[in-house]
Amino acid sequence: MWRTRWEDGAPTFTRNDEFLYCHTRYETFLRVMGDFQGIFECQYSADVLRDWVRNHVDQVLSLGIPHNWFLQVRPGSTMPELRDQLLDDVICCPERLIVLGKCVIMVDDHYEETELVLCMGGGTRLYIYEPSQEILLLCARHLDELARYGMMYTEAVYRQPQTPFATRVPHDVVAMLLRHGHDTDALAACVGEHHGRDVNFHTPGRHAKTLKLLTSFGCLTDCWPFEVAPAARLAECEMYVTLQLRCRWYLLGAVGSYRAGGFFDTSFLIIFDRFCRFYVVIVKSHLDRSPPLQRLAGEIYRLADSLEELFRAGLMKVYVRRRYEHGLRRAARLERNGGCVHMGEAARLHFTMFDSGVDRDYARQFRWLCRGDRFRAEMLNNWDGWDAFTIWQARVVRGDFAERRRPRSLGDGEEEDEGNDGRAMPVVRRRPPPMPRDDDEDNHVVPDNQNLEVIHDALADDEEQGEDDDDSGAEPMEPEENNVVPNVDRRGGEDAVAARMAAGHESDDDEWEDLGFDLEEDTVFDLKDVDEWFEQRRLAEKERWHLGQRIVNAYRTEAEVSEAEVEARRINLNTDLSPEWVKSFDFREHFV
């Protein structure tokens, strides 16, 4: 079997669909790492890596998963399909890519060549270039990920006829669907014949979900949360999907799981257009994840180009975002935008962050990756991937990979200690202690009670004099600017507070800003204006509904249309689509 299933005794996660439950065995991991050891140790220079590729032409390297996939080393100069390609326009950020070779598949006793070209970027990032679609696929973030999970994340693998199907049960339903998978009307009729049947929908490396086959969009009233939606909202959801696809489409089924109460809880909808291209509609939002993994309700993007690819890959393109292509092409195909792996430190190998001394020692890093105690039989992942702090603890305890000693500062009567190699320990120079402040700048002065009595008497006299001045009505004289001498009081504590009060400083509570209106005045709305606003909104919603209904009817009744014309509609019209349509899929209040 090309993948390992760990279904017996697997731990229970909070969301079991978000965790891989399979990876390569330790023997397979060592085989992949051993084959790519020369490439791993040459990553410091692009020229050295190209020389390595030229010196190892036609050498076959294992790719792990699937077990019969290999890399045949070839330089890029021998591939004519790469001469006119500008990969900088495809990838999210400028990155130098070095061609390593082509992917081949072992069938019986010979290798069958594919069109997939394997390239390597910075930090041993591995990309797959597919010339037929002019796309780049992120195969692995680094070589360690390739050795552990192989090509499992690469969608191009599931377009090859040699890849086995992940979805097989029930056999009669799957065989019947695959038989009519290239004819839209025949496939829709086949789904209608098996209405309500459950398919064990598998995604490689993930736990299976239930795909409930449904005849039409109106049949969703038997599934949660659509059973609580009124008929008008259900029709609005159907119109929104049509306005996104810009052509006639059909419903394949709902993907979800059965709850304890017996009802079917829907997470995704799988639909296909008149050209047998399959898409997913997000029903349940997932906002508690990082931005590359967030899924918003109402999002629609392509899952597969055929039913065979859908039953091989499952929901792989829902879980990962690793496809890079031109922006217009992505909008035409309704593809999900790939996340950028060049910004965060997560794109690099996490174990290189703990010790800068081995940052360029790739031979030592390779030994660290291939150590014998990295994998444990009772775990579904390597222990340093679950708890990265154990890397630092292991290095401190063992001390066999890096040794760090801080220079010891010398005391007043100590001399430099010469080591065995004749090198002297560096002398650490300390700063001189700060100069003590004057007595008048000391903030911790003990207050004098006699001075406080004098200050309070002076304060009372100032208040009486201020009242007399107010009664007389005479304006106080302002001093000239040139003769003003700043009075700086350096006393602290209670003396400073009393001095400010004696000087007649106003408190901060008296300072306020004139906002130009009365805050205590009650806000009064004109009910006539409010009713007029609601009436305008109601008319706008009614106009949007009628316009959408006319467009949907035109798409449903058109006899012939090419796929290129439909893709042109998506590029030109989907950008102007009202955001009110996507709100029809907002069922957050019905999910727990």
Curated annotation (Swiss-Prot):
Region spans: Disordered: 407-491
Signal peptide as annotated in the record: none
Keywords on record: Virion, Virion tegument
Identification of the protein by name: Protein US23
Subcellular location: Virion tegument
GN (gene name): US23
Highest taxon above the source species: Viruses
Keyword S-adenosyl-L-methionine attached: no
Main localisation: virion
Cellular component, GO annotation: viral tegument
Record-linked InterPro entries: US22-like
Any single Pfam family the record assigns to this protein: US22
Chain intervals with Acidic residues compositional bias: 460-481
Family: Belongs to the herpesviridae US22 family.
